[in-house]
């Protein structure tokens, strides 16, 4: 039975990713940007939290791009999502690629937090918060899922004019990097808002990095510029 908490999802957002599910592992598809940034975010997470031997949860795992990579770094990874088709793609890829120590479940972060509180060394929630009706609820669940002293990593889009121009006008309408309608500007989250969400539930900010894209070279890099895409590293207050 679906619980109230598991309804923190926009049906239209689920439909978007379900329609594109078969493209998740096509590096020339709409998911090409995720494949391009994956090594950067993976290395950043690993540099701060050391994945090897850790129990990791990837919230909003989609087709498993990050979950698969973290498992290959030596972590035992659970990917959680509510998009059935995307999860099937993730499971099939793990089987075909023989990825060790990775599994997937169709469950919300909120419901998993009730089932397995304080169970993970590391929780990641990447490129998801801007797609849900209640991001604070997701942040709260992530804080409940991680062990005291454990790490929670987020990535999302800042909310300002530059982010609107680059992430929506540029990426969706001019360059065609993403399908039109992928993002809604009103759902973008400023770093200060996300930091506030975290502090309310015992997550202390440890690091923040911007993610820059050069449309000419089609390359990405981490930087101090957080005006568009950014990654936030937090730690759960130890008891």
Which residues make up each language-model segment?
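Conserved alpha-helix/loop element of class I SAM-dependent methyltransferases that forms part
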Residues: 35-52
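A short glycine-rich, Lys/Arg-flanked "PGG" loop and its adjoining helix->strand segment in the class I
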Residues: 136-148
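Class I SAM-dependent methyltransferase SAM/SAH-binding core
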Residues: 65-111
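N-terminal, positively charged/glycine-rich alpha-helical extensions of SAM-dependent methyltransferases
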Residues: 1-25
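Acceptor-substrate binding/catalytic loop of class I
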Residues: 176-193
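A short acidic, Gly/Pro-enriched loop at the edge of an enzyme's catalytic core
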Residues: 113-122
């Amino acid at each position: 039975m679906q619980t109230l908490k598991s309804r923190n999802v926009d049906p239209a957002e689920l439909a978007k990713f379900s329609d594109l599910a078969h493209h998740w592992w096509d590096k020339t598809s709409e998911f090409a940007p995720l494949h391009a940034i994956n090594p950067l975010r993976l290395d950043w997470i690993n540099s701060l939290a050391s994945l090897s031997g850790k129990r990791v949860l990837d919230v909003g795992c989609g087709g498993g791009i990050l979950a698969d990579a973290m498992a290959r770094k030596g972590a035992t990874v659970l990917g959680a999502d509510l998009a059935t088709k995307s999860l099937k793609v993730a499971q099939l890829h793990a089987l075909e690629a023989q990825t060790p120590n990775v599994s997937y479940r169709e469950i919300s972060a909120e419901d998993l937090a009730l089932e397995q509180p304080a169970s993970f060394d590391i929780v990641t929630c990447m490129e998801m918060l801007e797609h849900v009706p209640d991001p604070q609820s997701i942040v709260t669940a992530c804080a409940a899922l991680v062990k005291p002293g454990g790490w929670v990593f987020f990535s999302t889009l800042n909310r300002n004019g530059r982010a609107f121009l680059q992430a929506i006008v540029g990426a969706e309408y001019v360059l065609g990097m993403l399908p039109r309608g992928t993002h809604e500007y009103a759902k973008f989250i400023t770093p200060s808002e996300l930091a506030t969400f975290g502090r309310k539930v015992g997550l202390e900010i440890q690091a923040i990095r911007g993610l820059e894209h050069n449309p000419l070279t089609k390359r990405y890099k981490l930087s101090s510029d957080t005006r568009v895409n950014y990654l936030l590293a937090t730690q759960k207050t130890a008891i």
